[in-house]
Every structure is written in structure tokens, then in C-alpha cells.
Amino acid sequence: MELTVESLDSPALTKAQLADLLFDEIGLNKRESKEMVDAFFELISQSLVTGEDVKLSGFGNFQIRTKAPRPGRNPRTGEAIPIEARRVVTFHASSKLKEQIQEGTTGSAS
């Protein structure tokens, strides 16, 4: 049985499954497929850590945003506690991806 996104057992696509899909679709060997997937995500991670935005045309943008400090509250005790400033990753889907999701289609010609 050929592995396709539609045949996945779980609702989430894992890195291992992505590597298997590359193996099936492109013909890389399994080691090369895994290394390519790992390298792709490592490049995205490194870029975000250094503060660079990651723009994937037709897919979306990953950005680092700084959240300001704010007052918080311990839900158990009601005690006021400060929440420190922090950096968070945000993802904004491209118009093309949003359109594909609404239509239930993919960008591939299969």
C-alpha cells in the first residue's frame, strides 16, 4: 500500500510520515528523506531563533513576536503574579492555503 496523506492513521502528519512520503513520491532513500526533513525544520528553527521571519510562498509565514509583560493571576490561590515578557512564534497561513482548505483541495496535480 502506498503511503499518502489521506491514508495516515493519525490526524497529524509527523516528521517520520513526511520522510516516508518523500521516499515514496520523490524516490530518495529513507535516510536521505529523513535527513532532508530534519534539515528543513532545523533551518526554520534556526531562522526563528535568530529573529528572522520564515516565508514559505503559497503556504504561510512564521514570525517571532514579543509579548509584553502583563499581570496574571494564580487560578488556585487568586494571588496576583507578574507574567514576564517573552517571544512567541506565530503562523499566518497564506491566502492560497486558506483557499485550498476552504475548497478541500491541494496544490498538487494528483
From Swiss-Prot:
Write down the PROSITE patterns for this protein, in alphabetical order: HISTONE_LIKE
Q: Which SMART domains match?
A: BHL
What biological process terms from GO does the record include? DNA recombination; positive regulation of metabolic process; regulation of DNA-templated transcription; regulation of translation
Q: From which domain of life does this come?
A: Bacteria
Q: Work out whether the entry's keyword set contains Iron-sulfur.
A: no
Summarize subunit and interaction data from the UniProt record for this chain: Heterodimer of an alpha and a beta chain.
Q: Which family does it belong to?
A: Belongs to the bacterial histone-like protein family.
**What HAMAP family does the record point to?**
IHF_alpha
What functional role does this protein have? This protein is one of the two subunits of integration host factor, a specific DNA-binding protein that functions in genetic recombination as well as in transcriptional and translational control.
Name assigned to this protein: Integration host factor subunit alpha
Organism encoding this protein: Delftia acidovorans (strain DSM 14801 / SPH-1)
